[in-house]
Amino acid sequence: MSTLHKHNTPQMAAITLLGLLLVASSIEIAGAESIGVCYGMLGNNLPNHWEVIQLYKSRNIGRLRLYDPNHGALQALKGSNIEVMLGLPNSDVKHIASGMEHARWWVQKNVKDFWPDVKIKYIAVGNEISPVTGTSYLTSFLTPAMVNIYKAIGEAGLGNNIKVSTSVDMTLIGNSYPPSQGSFRNDARWFVDPIVGFLRDTRAPLLVNIYPYFSYSGNPGQISLPYSLFTAPNVVVQDGSRQYRNLFDAMLDSVYAALERSGGASVGIVVSESGWPSAGAFGATYDNAATYLKNLIQHAKEGSPRKPRPIETYIFAMFDENNKNPELEKHFGLFSPNKQPKYNLNFGVSGSVETNATASLISEI
């Protein structure tokens, strides 16, 4: 005891405070870095690409999802240090699957020509392609397209930098309750299992679009609004030793369980879309959207009962997009087209601010 008291000097107190600040800073930065925002462009009144990227930077949004390799956006991203999930659109999947020469051309034109000035982290080959939706005509081409892009990325010398995956939705899940019993639909296993095997072998995550809003609005009699908005005061689902207070976690963990049942226990998940509309349909209100988004950003730092670690999550979307249909789809934006924020959201303080703060403390020690 006396030894400890002997070293309890103002200098040691300052060092201790510095350590606590650094820990707090690392937690805040980790939480902020867990969140990205999807940059959709289906509007006729949106800011230009340079303005958009400056808005990302000014709001400390460190990750961005592009749905296609728009060269104007990629040019604006140069030197921004923003990590990018780059989409290969559904319209290109069949072409890319047909031959390596097409994959090499796509990677050269849309990836290598911008690397390393643009920090491309993932290639999302296709979005929500599924044998049980209107995209079923593309299902046989998806895994071959992913393989070809993966090979082309490797040939370009970027295999250690960029992961190749695809973005799926919850229609592929056959059972999601309780979360530990999650499994893919039996009639989709022929499609899903090769994707899971590819991701396992290449150590890439599955990209999953998770929307508690659609589950709630489609079944409000059985799914409560607080459970959907992260505001339930008590445990809603007890699944063995795991307790679920929000639908987002339950949906996410059901996909983890489904991956495990398909041989993908080692495959991670990135939430490639999640959001809540502010108008346009049942349950789509400003207050609900504000509550969901604020709580999602906070919750992404914490993880789910099955995987209690930060969840890399991309919010849909940056702007309200007036060319989208149906009406509901026009109201998912975090910002209005005039760049004014719709909600008071905190994406975390920038590392430079925290570095300056800790630097001044160090100078006083």
Swiss-Prot record:
Keywords from the UniProt entry: Glycoprotein, Glycosidase, Hydrolase, Plant defense, Signal, Vacuole
Catalytic reaction annotation: Hydrolysis of (1->3)-beta-D-glucosidic linkages in (1->3)-beta-D-glucans
PROSITE patterns cross-referenced by the UniProt entry: GLYCOSYL_HYDROL_F17
Main localization, broad class: other
One GO cellular component, as annotated: vacuole
Entry's Gene Ontology BP terms: carbohydrate metabolic process; defense response
Pfam families in UniProt: Glyco_hydro_17
Subcellular location: Vacuole
InterPro entries, sorted: Glyco_hydro_17 (IPR000490), Glyco_hydro_17_plant (IPR044965), Glycoside_hydrolase_SF (IPR017853)
Full protein name: Glucan endo-1,3-beta-glucosidase, basic vacuolar isoform
Organism listed in the record: Nicotiana plumbaginifolia (Leadwort-leaved tobacco)
Gene name as annotated: GN2
